[in-house]
């Protein structure tokens, strides 16, 4: 039974189950305390947007503790954009070009009209942009994590930017923290997918790929 402010819904029999119930894995994300508890109690994979390594580690620790309170174990996923080129200089130039014609006022309007503009997660993405700007680091909140893409959109607001080895190292650092699933994208999507497949995917130990 879902009994919310705007939606009242009965599902008989309930059809949402975790993967243990022989259905696809249930991915769930959210940084609010309520969202974290929902994920800890019911999700198979807790999915998060980009953040600094220290913050990601803190979130994973918190979610493990919450899940243990329900005698459960969570898996973790990471959603980010990627800009990879043969050299770091080329990757950074591609990132700069991506937003080179953006009017900051238009970017702010895009973010503010999004339905999730007041969410905990979106506020955290904004905090990272502000921190990068305050540091004068060219929108990089930490090594190879670029928040510039978030100036033109809501939601997932950072990209892993670098040469193939740097991008791989960043992904491996997340894996060492305990992240198992990655949802990656870029602009234009097909072009960045091809570049990731060319430069990074061959360096990753992975199973069979299907399209």
For each predicted feature, which ranges?
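Glycine-rich, proline-tolerant flexible connector loops at the mouths of alpha/beta enzymes
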Residues: 50-53, 184-197
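An alpha-helical appendage that flanks or caps ligand/catalytic pockets
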Residues: 1-19, 51-176, 205-211
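Structural motif
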Residues: 41-42, 177
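A local structural motif
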Residues: 21-25
